[in-house]
């Protein structure tokens, strides 16, 4: 999937390092590359005991996310292990860490509906959400009442997305969107093993890109009952169509 990184005044080195880390993660965790560690694990070519520490950590994280979402986020929803729904947000987070280690505190990373934005100044990032009914347009969030107020912290910085025009304005925080309007009915409800189709789109904003991505997938699988579940997530804001 296309990945964009915006670092005001960033030099070539920081871009190269960030993209190199993203390629490294893709080579290890892709389910489409037959030689990736995940693919070999799925095909039983590697025992779980012999997996890399990084993959073991991801498996543990996927199991924890499954438990925290009452099973609605599952890397095993389709039968075979597929950590893609977790790894995408984690990969963005990893790239963000590399950028910050190089001294850059203002940046924006976007990949397939997931966005991580950071700023140490007055700069805000205006983020549009694709309209699932008319993908050529942006979703008008002013017409959607948020189902949760947001006040979360990223380190000692406050993440406070605000609705602007049709989208969100963010200084420090994350936005993750899940839907079936681009890739078809690819999100499975782990409870009944059927494609989730009650909703068209779920957008979650909050302080952490990994958890926002997990929540977007889980709530999409839940359908409308996801509104009630989000009451247990006070640091995250929900928009659904």
Task: Cite the ranges covered by each PLM segment.
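Mature catalytic core of soluble alpha/beta enzymes
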Residues: 1-241
